[in-house]
Amino acid sequence: MSDDKLFEITKSDLAGRIGILHSNHGKIETPAYVPVIHPVKQTIPAKKIKQIGFDLVITNAYITMKRHGETAIKKGIHGIIDYDGAVMTDSGGYQVLEYGDVDVSPIDMAEFEKKIMTDFAIPLDKPTGYGLSKKKAKSYVDQTLKVAKKTLDDSIDNGQLWLGPMQGGEHK
């Protein structure tokens, strides 16, 4: 998808803007609320979320990989969560932050996200969290940037969009 067809601004006022984000699974009006759904345990079924009016959801590719594996590749993320709108997947950065590591490389995670045909994918990052030295936090950000560049270099033109993870941290 070309950059000029990815996002269109329909109205702007001062620093704000309203627009339409285009994906392989439809249009998303922005700004948008984006519900997070668990790929295994859905309290509210994804179909119901679509009926309510949400055009985009976010789910976790790492959990999808661990619980569904090859089935997710065969069915795609839309089939796994039973949702026909746009889907964004996070690659497991929170799990890295929470548990210290995940048992998949960033490159393998990116390949998985490609294969499950998520509309918007986020490369596996190394979150900075809180309490790291400035040097350590910088090394985590540098590692994330390196992975993001490699992911983009290896991406294919299939309409899938890659988004950079937001890094926190307490240092300037």
Describe the residue ranges of each PLM region.
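Non-catalytic, usually N-terminal nucleic-acid engagement modules in DNA/RNA processing proteins
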Residues: M1-I156
